[in-house]
Structure formats: C-alpha cells, structure tokens
Amino acid sequence: MLDQPLTEFLERGLAIHMGTRNAALRPNGCRVTAVRVEDQGRNLVAFIPKAVTPAVLEDLRANGQAALSFARPTDDRAVQVKGEFISAQDADAVEEAFVLGQWQSLLEELALIGLAPLTSTSTWQMWPCVAVKLRVTAVFSQTPGPEAGSVLA
C-alpha cells in the first residue's frame, strides 16, 4: 500500500500526529516521535511517547481506528494515513537511535523555518516510546492545493 517514495517521505522525520476516538466519539490524539514502514508498505509502526499513551492506547484497543497526519514544515507537503490497530509494545533500546534520529530530522526542518529547537520543543519528552503497529487501510494527500484529499493508496 505504501510504495517506496512514500515510505521514504514518511520515514524522513516529519511533524506527525496520531488521532483516534473514544466510545463517545470524542477525539483523542498525541504527537508521534517517528514511524517505520514494514511488510512492503502494508503496515506502519508509530512510536508514541510513553508519557502520553494511556488514553490513546485505550481508545485504539477499544475501536481499532487511527489516522496519522504527516507534514513537512518547509514546504507543507502533507499526507494522512488511516489504519487499523494491530498491536502495541514498549519500544526497545535497539530502536531508540532510529526513533530519535527521525525526531532530530524534524527539529532540523523546524530550524529551517525559524523555530529554534530550544524554544519550541525542549520540554517535550519524546522517548521512551510505545511502538503501535497499524495495518494501513488508506492514504490521502493533505498538501494544500488542488490535489488535497486525493487518494494516494
């Protein structure tokens, strides 16, 4: 479902947010530190900070639905990936460098548009993480312009 060019975009270090909802249809969400595309693009692992996971994980386990918004700050290219919850487990030490590497790439992107990391993100706790695995069900362009909302996969 996620081809190689899209995988490379998603894994480069972007501003990422995961949204879900509770049984009363109230939205819930969190920042995502990094993602990894797996299984030839059929699945995606979102690394979400442990500090913010309890309610999000509860909602994912209850309804199984998630939407991830990806945006590159320097040009506003954006993608939405919808998915179904497969599993969640603590991310391990081997994954830490990969995850924080993507986070560092986002900080570099933010610096290019004038948002210094020390002023905009210094209090965010981005590790340790929970690795949330999703089966990709739909992908949409969210880049502003005439193609916004178009199906990518």
Question: What residue spans do the PLM features occupy?
Answer:
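Short, basic/aromatic recognition patches
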Residues: 1-15
